[in-house]
Amino acid sequence: MADLRVNLFGKQLAGPVIAASGTFGFGPEYAGIEDLRVLGGISGKGLTLNGQPGNDGERLLETPSGLMNSIGLQNPGVQHFIENELPAMKTCGTSVWVNLGGHTIEENVEGVQKLCAAGIDVLELNISCPNVKQGGLAFGIRAKDAEEVVSAVSKVCTVPLVVKLSPQAESIPDMCKAVEAAGADGISLCNTFQACAIDLEKRRPVFNNTFAGLSGPAIRPIALRMVWQAVGAVNIPVIGLGGILTGRDALEFIMAGAAAVQVGTANFLDPKACTRITAEIGEWMDAHGVKTLDEIRGCARG
């Protein structure tokens, strides 16, 4: 019987699959559907220091091999989460990851301080948010901007700090090196790709903001390439995500060197995707005589 446990940040996780932010609520919503204890963790719906109403207009559009979303970080805010969502999230029997974004360095720092004090397991910093002090350019585009925000956050973060990277970064290897140098304990990538769709009848973009984030199997080969680059650039753990639908998909990321994986869009297709993929990984390992994930992690790199 394969041992699916993963050692990450000095702790042992039950499995290599973590539910990705924005696709799994805060966790309790799925507690009656699947056994969450077999997961490596749950990264809850993305938060900002203060709540946001999200975007107007269309928010979701299915593509031939993916999903476009323009949610706009709708969320109740950090304090509401701490008081109303976190207690139930802690009962799910798996590692509590909290995804946080902010429009200024100060917002990020204050949010991290509050969340760490509330008792979470991992802080996942989303640096795809626009930096209002840099003309709206996301923190995750230029390495120097990412290094600045991660450095400030790492000084106050008392739990493992995972930085979630944007695929729009100018250079994935340089970005990874910058956030590692700034104090990140791990990296997750990649976030959604910017995409566009046109409504032919209205003769205008489907989404009010013109562009939306593309996820799903269409991006998987590109995400895998970026994970490969990240693993080769840094010495901290890399969590791979982007279009994982099956155990075989997840194993590709692990063989590329990922310490663990996150599953996102697949949860919309199959509410049991995370536990199913975990089981499929174990089945493949048993069929191939692989006892632990360490035996195959990074094996494709030679």
Walk through the language-model features, giving the residues of each:
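N-terminal capping/small domains of soluble enzymes
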Residues: M1-V96, G102
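Active-site metal-binding loops of divalent metal-dependent hydrolases
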Residues: G22-T23, G242-I244
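Alpha/beta enzyme core
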Residues: G32, H103-I239, L245-A258, V263
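Short gly/pro/ser/thr-enriched loop/turn and capping motifs at secondary-structure boundaries
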Residues: T48-P53, P130-V132, Q194-A197, F268-D270
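C-terminal helical cap(s) of enzyme catalytic domains, especially alpha/beta-barrels
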Residues: G54-P64, I198-A212, I254, A266-K291
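Small/polar glycine-rich anion-binding or flexible loop at a beta-alpha turn
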Residues: I244-R248, D270, G302
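A short, charged, Gly/Pro-tolerant segment at domain boundaries
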Residues: D294-G302
